[in-house]
Amino acid sequence: GKWMIAAGMAIFGDNNPFGWRFSAALIGTLSVALVAYAAWLLFRSMTVATIAAILASVDGLMFVESRLALLDIFQMFWILATFVCLLLDRQQSRRVLARKVVALAQQNGGTLPQLVFGPGSGWHLWRLAAGVCAGAAVGVKWNSLFFIAAFGLLTVFWDVNARRILGLKNWAVVGALREGLPAFVQMIGVGLIVYLSTWAGWFKSSNAFYRHWAQDNPGQGVQWLPTD
């Protein structure tokens, strides 16, 4: 979030009010588009998407946050982006899984064979993108973790439910194992890497805020444990 604010200041000057407001205004505008796109992916209705965009654009809190150099609008943007990526992943993975099930049925004379595990849903590239956005959201504010945890459970539920709809055997247990572990790596693993990368400037700097706090406040007994 602070990097995004700094980008506007770098372009228009750090003493220019427009510079430190620019990124928030841009991200707030893009957030309206994400709300509309999420509504369209959920309901496949341009009317619903338009109503969602209008409601988002006239929301008082969202309007105010888009005018200020605060972190909330950037957190909302990355959380929305995570959700949209997961919606796209649901769409793509279900399409891939359905194609594989149809192919198996055709090979078996039109009847789906009773496989123990069933086919996988392929590479979840959109879920990887969701992991990137999730890491960025946590990099803005730690309380984004609550949203990410809910999204992680939601994406696994979608995958498991897709297997149930297609009539695959042992859809609950197999789906949770086959989709849950990759989802954890893609959401949490990738997100953790992205989150740590947001601290790159702090690690590279020698005079960053609290950069040498651990050295100046060594622990007692267990040396890595601070005194207070």
Predicted features along the sequence, with ranges:
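Short hydrophobic/aromatic helix or loop-helix immediately within or flanking a transmembrane segment
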Residues: 1-18, 23-26
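Short acidic/glycine- and proline-prone juxtamembrane loop motifs at membrane-interface regions
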Residues: 20, 24, 67-74, 140-143
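Transmembrane-helix motifs of polytopic, lipid-linked glycan transferases
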Residues: 22-43, 81
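Membrane-interfacial entry segments at the cytosolic side of transmembrane helices
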Residues: 166-189
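Aromatic-rich transmembrane-lumenal/periplasmic boundary elements in polytopic membrane proteins
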Residues: 172, 193-228
